[in-house]
C-alpha cells in the first residue's frame, strides 16, 4: 500500500491542464475609483458619438409617370392648391397649440390657487 502512494502522481497533475500545480488565482476586481471614473474605457474628454440622422430622400413624382395610365395624372392646379394648404397649415397648428397651452396654463393657475386657499384654511389664516 505504501508503494502505491509513492507511485501516484499528485492530484494537481491528474487534471486536464498542461501545467502542474494549483490553478491560477482569481483576478482582482478593479478599484472603486476606477469604476467610478469609468476605468480605461475610451477617452474621457471626448463626448460619446452622436446618433446618425435619418436620411431624407427626395422622391420625384415625375419619375413614376410611366407607371400611370392616361387620366391618372393630377392637373397642375390641384398641386398648387395643395402647396398653398401646406403653407397655411403650420400657422394653424401653431395657433391651435398656443390656444391649448393657454388653456393648460389657466387650469394650472386655478389649481394652484385652490391648493393655496386650502392650505390657508388648514392653517387657520383668514384675510
Curated annotation (Swiss-Prot):
Its main location: host cell. One of its GO terms (cellular component) is host cell cytoplasm. The keyword Phosphoprotein applies. It is found in: Host cytoplasm; Host nucleus. Residues 1-94 are annotated as: Disordered. Residues 79-88 have a biased composition (Acidic residues). Keywords: Early protein, Host cytoplasm, Host G2/M cell cycle arrest by virus, Host nucleus, Host-virus interaction, Modulation of host cell cycle by virus, Phosphoprotein. One of its GO terms (biological process) is symbiont-mediated arrest of host cell cycle during G2/M transition. Phosphorylated by host ERK. The phosphorylation triggers a structural change that enhances keratin binding and protein stability. Belongs to the papillomaviridae E4 protein family. The major E4 form is first synthesized as an E1^E4 fusion protein from spliced E1^E4 transcripts, such that the first few amino acids of the E4 protein are derived from the N terminus of E1. Assembles into oligomeric complexes. Interacts with host CDK1. Interacts with host SRPK1; this interaction may favor expression of late viral transcripts. Interacts with host cytokeratin components KRT8 and KRT18. Contributes to multiple aspects of the viral life cycle including viral genome amplification, suppression of suprabasal cell differentiation and egress of newly formed virions. Induces host cell cycle arrest at the G2 phase by associating with and preventing the nuclear entry of host CDK1/cyclin B1 complexes. Inhibits cellular DNA replication by preventing loading of host replication licensing proteins MCM2 and MCM7 onto chromatin. Within the cytoplasm, associates with host kinase SRPK1, a splicing factor regulator, and inhibits its activity. This is Protein E4. It comes from Human papillomavirus 4.
